[in-house]
Amino acid sequence: MPWIVGVSGASGTPYAAAVLRALLAAGESVDLVVSRASRLTLLDETGISFRDAHWRHDLREWLARGADGKPDTFDADVSGVRHWSAGDLAAGPSSGSYPTKGMLIVPASTACVAGVALGLSKDLLQRAASVTLKERRRLVVAVRETPLDGRTLRHLVTLDDAGASVVPASPAFYAGATHIQDLVDFVAGRVLDAAGVGHGLYRRWRGDLGGARPTG
């Protein structure tokens, strides 16, 4: 069964790329939903246009770049990815009878959070998230906005009460980050932790003052 990965319009497309790379590296299959707003963000942050007609090519180009926009070493094999148009409300993930392991929304904008919390289902991303909740599957929401007002905080509490895991895109610094990608990978790793997916994206805290930094 696949994981659904939804990409909303918040800044933070490198987080989505890191999660996708890790899922594929772990041998997971992915159903990808890229919202209209996120395509504008992706273009602004990476210069990549994500087009439905050429999504495999565009996804390979996206995943082959690091957070700094430079070429990465990732072998962008996207054979494990199935793309669904965000406007296709008849797509598989719109139904509870379509089997999935759960859904990761990364990054999640406040508009996306509100839509899911209120059950609006304005597009496939929101509909798939609502289905994930009603089917009691794992939903991880990586909210990437600051500051957060009372309305958004209440929406996040609603999602938590409904069974979602809310993972703010807030990197930690104890892992000895030296590059932007290290910070991105930490957040992506925490998203995957919440989903129960194994990975090696960051060094974990060991319970001493040395933290997760390498020794020797």
From Swiss-Prot:
Keywords: Flavoprotein, FMN, Prenyltransferase, Transferase. One of its GO terms (molecular function) is flavin prenyltransferase activity. Signal peptide: none annotated. FMN binds at residues 9-11, 35, 144. It is an enzyme of class 2 (transferase). Its EC number is 2.5.1.129. It comes from the Bacteria. Dimethylallyl phosphate binds at residues 174, 190. Pfam families: Flavoprotein. It catalyses: dimethylallyl phosphate + FMNH2 = prenylated FMNH2 + phosphate. InterPro entries: Flavin_trans-like, Flavoprotein, UbiX-like. NCBIfam families: ubiX_pad. Flavin prenyltransferase that catalyzes the synthesis of the prenylated FMN cofactor (prenyl-FMN) for 4-hydroxy-3-polyprenylbenzoic acid decarboxylase UbiD. The prenyltransferase is metal-independent and links a dimethylallyl moiety from dimethylallyl monophosphate (DMAP) to the flavin N5 and C6 atoms of FMN. Belongs to the UbiX/PAD1 family. This is Flavin prenyltransferase UbiX. The lineage of its organism: Bacteria, Bacillati, Actinomycetota, Actinomycetes, Kitasatosporales. The gene is ubiX.
